[in-house]
Amino acid sequence: DLPYIDFSKPWWSPSTTNDLTYGDDKALIAVGDLALSSLAATYCYFYDKTDAETYKIEDLYDVVWDGKWTIDYVMQVTKDIYEDLNGNGERDEEDYYGMTQQMQSALNTYLWACGGRVVQKNAQGIPELVYKTEKTNNIIEKLYQLCYESEGVCTARKFDQSMVTSSADDVIHYIGAISFKENMTLMTAGTLDMTINYFRDKSTEYGILPYPKYDEAQEDYYTMVDGYHAALAIPKSVQDLDFVGIITEALNAESYKIVFPAYYEVALKTKYAYDDESVQMLDMIVDSRIFDFGYVYDAWKGMTFYFQT
């Protein structure tokens, strides 16, 4: 037990105690507001509002609120959206599509968005593998339809590495962000920090949506946070637990009061959200974040990554 740490406080993610603990609520790592990247790395959908009007698409915010924002809906609304931008008469990587789907971590996110999990805690609080289920198989089949059988979805682009804002990341992870920035797609999936890193100079207004549900019977929208976000842990070698505990709690509390609002309320909600509806969507998305024990501890090579190609 670490003195002064209180996971009931609002500067700690509820998922820390709900999903990242084991046994009698033991936690090896925790996610708090000091780890600002846990907000930046949250997955969502983006859609081009100007193009949505051009293609006479209904108000997608209403679709979300009505519980009809599903993978089937995404396939239906994008299936006939296409434009031959390079004029070669062929559907290829240089054309405009209804949806551009990155086939890496943004694809993995559908597992949680559709109500699936890698592990869940049993009655004793011990994480158990729940990945190999009929539910997971159904999600995979649905994603196959989205990525390989829907003509309105593009899964490959020929972008240069120089178009990535961080030279350390491979361009394959950002085909959705670049396509959206360059007005080559109606919608895409990505992380919230793309609003700052890629879309600040986008020529048209866009909206922010949660990941779609598996079907309308699913009650809630869910999302996950990409693995590049920070988390907090205390080394076993620490001797002055009182000092570490009170400083850790204080830093998270002050970030909650000062830093988090500057990023979330000012940057994301004010500078990079174009309407009040996107602000409401942001609150929904952030409140629905899941930190799956099986994803956090799989070291980028576990079952979590079976979805991506």
Question: What is each PLM-predicted segment?
Answer:
Residues 50-64:
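Aromatic-glycine-rich donor-binding/catalytic loop that engages nucleotide-sugar donors
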Residues 103-104, 189-195:
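Beta->alpha turn/N-cap motifs
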Residues 12-45, 53, 70-128:
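Extracytoplasmic/periplasmic solute-binding protein
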Residues 198-266:
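Extracytoplasmic/periplasmic substrate-recognition and gating elements
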Residues 71, 75-80, 110-112, 117-169:
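Glycine-centered hinge/linker elements that transmit conformational signals in sensory
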Residues 261-309:
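C-terminal capping/gating helix-and-loop segments adjacent to ligand/active sites or protein-protein/ligand interfaces
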Residues 2-10, 64-66, 117-138, 216-222:
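Short, solvent-exposed loop/beta-turn-alpha elements that line the ligand-binding surface or hinge
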Residues 185-191, 207:
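Paired acidic/hydrophobic, glycine-rich loop segments that form the ligand-binding mouth/hinge
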